[in-house]
Regions:
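Glycine-rich phosphate/pyrophosphate-binding loop shared by adenosine-nucleotide-utilizing enzymes
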Residues: 2-4, 66-72, 158
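A short beta-loop-alpha structural element at the N-terminal edge
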Residues: 5-19
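Helix-loop element at the rim of GNAT/NAT acetyltransferase active sites that forms part
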Residues: 19-36
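Acetyl-CoA-dependent GNAT
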Residues: 25, 37-94, 106-107, 166-170
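Active-site acidic-Proline motif in GNAT/NAT acetyltransferases
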Residues: 90-95, 99, 127-128
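Conserved acetyl-CoA-binding loop-helix of GNAT-fold acetyltransferases
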Residues: 98-111, 115, 134-138
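Conserved GNAT acetyl-CoA-binding A-motif
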Residues: 113-124
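Conserved catalytic-core motifs of GNAT/GCN5-like acyltransferases
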Residues: 122-125, 137-159
């Protein structure tokens, strides 16, 4: 297996991240966007990364292999009364599925959460994304509900499962 490197995103990564998002969006229907990527310019992405890097409870990781981004994951924290929570998001290029990259990203985000006093990690996953759900369950995420017709694509509705990892149990 070829080596990959996970690190925090920097503003200099913005253009590569935008290209990556267009690629990964075109490879799967499990994301909220398609091959058009996200409607954001390189300058807007740079500012987004700068803001994330300033926030105490948020992080954006990118996975590099052979000079290209092949995955990303984020924790988006909240303020005040919800500062003990963060929302998790992840994507990996299809050619790298099953290579442990998603698990490595998830481990990195869990470690970040523990180091930054984040007690609950929430995520939303399409209910038929069995591969992702299996990985989340392996890391002790539990399903707390289902949001029906959460997502609509080409006239078809898809349910999403809401899952949470409770890190408070580990602190007791």
């Amino acid at each position: 297996m070829e080596e990959f490197d996970i690190r925090e995103a920097t503003p200099e990564d913005a253009e590569k991240i935008i290209a990556y998002l267009a690629q990964v969006g075109g490879e799967t229907d499990y994301l909220s966007f398609g091959k058009e990527g996200l409607p954001i310019s390189a300058e807007e992405e740079e500012k987004f990364i700068q803001n994330i890097n300033k926030e105490e409870h948020s992080v954006l990781y990118v996975v590099w292999k052979n000079g290209e981004i092949i995955g990303d994951a984020s924790l988006s924290g909240f303020s005040r009364r919800m500062s003990h929570r963060a929302e998790f998001g992840i994507s990996v290029v299809k050619s790298e599925w099953g290579q442990g990259i998603g698990s490595a990203l998830l481990q990195k985000c869990i470690m970040y959460a523990k180091e930054h006093a984040i007690e609950l990690i929430n995520l939303e996953v399409r209910s038929d994304n069995i591969r992702a759900i299996h990985v989340y369950e392996k890391y002790s995420f539990r399903k707390i509900g289902t949001s029906p017709a959460y997502y609509k694509m080409d006239g078809t509705y898809y349910d999403f499962d809401l899952m949470v990892l409770d890190l408070r149990r580990e602190r007791r």
